[in-house]
C-alpha cells in the first residue's frame, strides 16, 4: 500500500519526518514524499531517500495521504476514489470541505477531532501542537519584552520580575505557565473552568477566579462559550490585570469556532510601556 506525504502550500510543517517514514517502511508501506516537503522543517529530500522514501512531484495520488493542512480543490481531484486522507480538516468550521471529500468517495480522518481522553492520547496531535504554541508564545514574548523575566539584584539596583497573565489554561495555557514560571516570572492565570485552578497553582502560578461559569466545560473536556454576565465580569478582570501585568498571553479556544477575542485595544493601551 502506498502512502503520500505532500508539500504544504503555506506551512513549514510536514506530516511525516524521516523517522516516521522509516517506521512506515518497516510496516511494509511504500512512502512517496513530494519534492521539498520537509524543507520547511529542516528535512531535505536526501534525508527521506536514506530511509527508503521515494521523492515524487505529486504525492496526492496515493492510497493514503498524510497532510497537515486541508487540501485545495485541485489536490482533492488528484486523489483516488476510495483513498484515505489523514489531516487537520476542521469539519465543524468548514463543512463544505467535508461534503466535497465525501462526494469524491474519499475516506477522511480529521486529526483535530480526536477526543481528549486517555485512551486516545497517543493520537492527540492537536494537544501536541498546542503544547508547542504555548511554549513558543513565552519565548516570543521574552524576546519582545527586552529585559529579564526573573528579578535581578545588581549594583545599579533591583529589577522586578516580569508579571505574566495567561488567559486559558488548556494544554497551550499550561505550557505557557510552565515556560514563564521556569524563566522566573510571576504568573497569573484564569479560565472559564474553575476546576483547572488546582493545576495552575501546582505549577506555581496564581489562579484568578472570575466566578462560576455557566456550563463552561463540554462533555469532552473542552471549554464552551460562556454567557454575557460571565463575559462582562471576565472583561473587567482582564482590564484590571492589563494595567498591572507586563505580558498577556491568550490561549482560550472553543473547538469548531474562531478563538474568542478577549483583549481590547483599550486594554492594550492601558498596559505599561
Outline where the language-model segments fall.
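An N-terminal-biased, well-structured beta-alpha scaffold segment characteristic
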Residues: 1-100, 104
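Helix-to-beta-strand junctions that scaffold the AdoMet/dcAdoMet cofactor pocket
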Residues: 80, 271-272
